[in-house]
Amino acid sequence: MKNIKTMTMEWTGNSLILIDQRYLPIEEKYVECQNYLDVANSIKDMVVRGAPAIGATAAFGFVLGAKEFSYLSDKNLFSNKLEEVKNSLSKTRPTAVNLFWALNRMDKILKDNLPTKEINDLVTILEEEALKIAYEDIEINKQIGKNGEALLNDGDTVLTHCNAGALATVDYGTALGVIRAAVENGKDIQVYADETRPYLQGARLTVWELVKSGIKTTLITDNMAGWVMKQGKINAVIVGADRIARNGDVANKIGTYSVAVLAKRHGIPFYVAAPLSTIDIETKNGEGIPIEERNHNEVRFCHKTRLVTDDVNIYNPAFDVTPNELVTAIITEKMVIRPPYEINIVKLF
């Protein structure tokens, strides 16, 4: 288990190659990260995005940091340098909890083995752990798909928001993994995909993934979601998550809250598909989740086309929080969690 290659990422043993999601679907470009700062920049600049994918990417960034400082002879100095690596990576995206989960897991492996292992052995152990995180993610997503597809009926049409597919994970996907599993199980499933302004992950990534998979997909603008629900075209909504609080409040891509409100109004089940690593058991509710605000030019421009002049005020939160009362169920690899979330989430930890 020395390498991994998926649609999202490839670990070569000395570098991490990421598909550059900023250019999809028009161009398939790749970024090769040769050190941990390359990885940090790729996460920050959204070369890679999606909480599980960010977590795995950060783990490999930690390994690249270990390789970079493996020339040191002092293990304490080596550990201190990796603390700097961890801090650099952790500052990239504040909302996606998988980032911190993966870095803490890597740091624990380092600390557990530091007293008894030499530096070269530590590097090997860290690389094995990062690969384990990546391979585990794929299996977890497949189990999420298996658990979630039972909620879909043959002939259902699902609305999605943003991208929680293979591109948002190491492979297979969470929300799209549920759809993928249902199709693999012989169900006829169609999808309506919100374009997801301002970064257009739904239009650029979700539609690209689903079309490549042969799943019938219709693209709509975000402000069409309520109308297609009212027309009776939607049987279920499935989204991913970047962080889930202990009470079941869900932070996900901006616009998710609006979709959840609309789903509630129209009596449509609203499902969240996410691994247990996305649940932040230390955060009591959504009020404690930090919401990243991104560069205003993501709204001022649509790709390279200017939409408004520089004197226009812009507000660009990357995420919103959907309160637990709007969430029908949370689909995890262990089980489908239903209300009361305050009780049922804690039981899993």
Curated annotation (Swiss-Prot):
GO terms for biological process: L-methionine salvage from methylthioadenosine. Pfam families: IF-2B. Its EC number is 5.3.1.23. Keywords: Amino-acid biosynthesis, Isomerase, Methionine biosynthesis. One of its GO terms (molecular function) is S-methyl-5-thioribose-1-phosphate isomerase activity. InterPro entries: IF-2B-related, IF-M1Pi, IF_2B-like_C, Initiation_fac_2B_a/b/d, M1Pi_N, NagB/RpiA_transferase-like. Disulfide bonds: none annotated. The record marks 162 as: Transition state stabilizer. The keyword Amino-acid biosynthesis applies. Signal peptide: none annotated. Substrate binds at residues 49-51, 93, 201, 252-253. Pathway: Amino-acid biosynthesis; L-methionine biosynthesis via salvage pathway; L-methionine from S-methyl-5-thio-alpha-D-ribose 1-phosphate: step 1/6. It comes from the Bacteria. It catalyses: 5-(methylsulfanyl)-alpha-D-ribose 1-phosphate = 5-(methylsulfanyl)-D-ribulose 1-phosphate. The active site is at 242 (proton donor). Catalyzes the interconversion of methylthioribose-1-phosphate (MTR-1-P) into methylthioribulose-1-phosphate (MTRu-1-P). HAMAP family: Salvage_MtnA. Belongs to the EIF-2B alpha/beta/delta subunits family. MtnA subfamily. This is Methylthioribose-1-phosphate isomerase. It comes from Petrotoga mobilis (strain DSM 10674 / SJ95). The gene is mtnA.
